[in-house]
Amino acid sequence: MTDIDPHIWGPSFWSTYHLYASSYPIHPTPIIMDAARSFVKTIPFTLPCSSCTDHAFAYIKNIQKQDPDLISIVSSKMLFEKFFIDFHNSVNYRLGKPLLPESVARKKWRF
């Protein structure tokens, strides 16, 4: 894999993730939950950075240990939004960046 600097693509990816979460239905149907589950599982494959890919796989796998079907992520809009905020903050923490307050995320991406 050719690593591309996350400063180039990271902000766009985060905006995509958070905007997807902001448009997620309050009460998703089973089909929408399946699509969201697939989206989350696909995230590591879309990252053009090997350490980012490794982190995403580990983060998602850790959730799947307790929740193999990711119900705790996809069963409601609030949980889906929270997943992406928590995921974003796990990356920020790993990189020594400031954490993203939920209130800031909600204002920026209009949750």
UniProtKB/Swiss-Prot annotation:
E.C. code: 1.8.3.2
GO molecular-function term, one example from the UniProt record: flavin-dependent sulfhydryl oxidase activity
Bilayer-spanning residue ranges: none
Cofactor(s) this protein cannot do without: FAD
Disulfide bond is among the record's keywords: yes
First-tier enzyme category under EC: oxidoreductase
Any Pfam family matching the protein: Evr1_Alr
The organism's place on the tree of life at top rank: Viruses
ERV/ALR sulfhydryl oxidase domain: residues covered: 2-109
Disulphide connectivity of cysteines: 49-52
Catalytic reaction(s) noted: 2 R'C(R)SH + O2 = R'C(R)S-S(R)CR' + H2O2
Role: FAD-dependent sulfhydryl oxidase that catalyzes disulfide bond formation.
PANTHER family, sorted: ALR/ERV, FAD-LINKED SULFHYDRYL OXIDASE ALR
Name of the featured protein: Putative FAD-linked sulfhydryl oxidase 347L
Source organism of this protein record: Invertebrate iridescent virus 6
